[in-house]
Amino acid sequence: MAVQRTFSIIKPDAVAKNVIGKITTRFEEAGLKIVASKIKQLSKAEAEGFYAEHSARGFFGDLVAFMTSGPVVVQVLEGENAIALNRELMGATNPKEAAAGTIRADFAESIDANAVHGSDSEAAAAREIAYFFAATEVTTR
């Protein structure tokens, strides 16, 4: 099993609920290390650029509006099979379908306000990390 890096966003709904620490604890207790982190308010341009692959889909405008509705926490997580592990911790995109004990089952409201985002592949992780972090901002622990 390889050590990987993955990208995570704690979305505005979870930040507003003040559960950043609870979510971060889940990452760490599962063996993931946080090697970069920032709290930021996304601009419309940043959100549109990050989610550009969805620009032709009907939900794009609502997604951008939601992601700019409040601050987010962007993070780089590192660990054995970090991408798959993070996706397992998050649970299904729709919190109603998420397994009990997953982040989305415990903290998300809806398929739109679903608490967290995580990279779905190594290519996506590399792109998403580079979108928010310079190489000098990502450490090794």
UniProtKB/Swiss-Prot annotation:
UniProt-listed Enzyme Commission number(s): 2.7.4.6
GO terms of biological process kind: CTP biosynthetic process; GTP biosynthetic process; UTP biosynthetic process
Alphabetized GO MF terms: ATP binding; metal ion binding; nucleoside diphosphate kinase activity
SUPFAM superfamilies associated with the record: Nucleoside diphosphate kinase, NDK (SSF54919)
Keyword tags: ATP-binding, Cytoplasm, Kinase, Magnesium, Metal-binding, Nucleotide metabolism, Nucleotide-binding, Phosphoprotein, Transferase
Cofactor dependence: Mg(2+)
Subcellular location as annotated: Cytoplasm
Reactions catalysed according to its record: a 2'-deoxyribonucleoside 5'-diphosphate + ATP = a 2'-deoxyribonucleoside 5'-triphosphate + ADP; a ribonucleoside 5'-diphosphate + ATP = a ribonucleoside 5'-triphosphate + ADP
Positions that bind ATP: K11, F59, R87, T93, R104, N114
Main location: cytoplasm
Database matches in PROSITE patterns: NDPK, NDPK_LIKE
Xref: InterPro entries: NDK-like_dom, NDK-like_dom_sf, Nucleoside_diP_kinase, Nucleoside_diP_kinase_AS
GO terms under cellular component: cytoplasm
Active-site feature positions: H117
CDD domains, sorted: NDPk_I
Presence of the UniProt keyword Transferase in the record: yes
Function of the molecule: Major role in the synthesis of nucleoside triphosphates other than ATP. The ATP gamma phosphate is transferred to the NDP beta phosphate via a ping-pong mechanism, using a phosphorylated active-site intermediate.
Subunit structure: Homotetramer.
Official protein name in the record: Nucleoside diphosphate kinase
